[in-house]
Amino acid sequence: MNEINIQRIDTYEDERFDQEALNQHGCFVVNGKFPYQIKIISKDSALIKGEEKYYNEIINDFRFFAEHIINFYSMDGKIIKKFKPPTIFDLDLDKIQPTQFYIDRKKLDAVKTFVKNKEDIIIPVAKYEDQYISLDGHTRLYLAYKLGFSFIYAFITKSFDGTDYFVKESKKRGVKAVKDMILLSHEDYRQKWDKFCDEYFASLEN
């Protein structure tokens, strides 16, 4: 079986993809040459564009932290894949412990283009001791705080390896709530947060 390499595009400028999909971080390239994009169109549905050959792999990669997206359609409206919905519940914003210290201003600007109300914010969380830990969606959470939302929507999922470490490091830096995360320029974010993550995961290989 041929190995499949999936690269998720983390920039906001790429002529191969729609801007809306780029803003949602729903763009991928398989084996360096096959472009795919997934564009969320409602709270539980998305459109997928690209060669049908790798649909399953792209959808599975996309849903790693987006299990609330359960219906995937082709561009002509054909249902491609359907999943069982997770249990979604209201969660007070001030009860969430982040696993991230910083927010990228450029990503925040992108998120503002598609987050307009509470219903647009559904994030994966894990129970940790007596708290809920946010596993993804920190930019959306920060925007919720800035918009004055008192709660968002969430679903329980499995924590990732190293969750304990990221929680500990967040608290050590005084990041104990969504409002404590620090907004940085895109350049500073890459230098501080990306570097921190790279060094952590590199240490696991030693």
Annotated model-derived regions:
Residues 2-135, 139, 145:
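Short alpha-helix boundary/capping and kink motifs at helix termini
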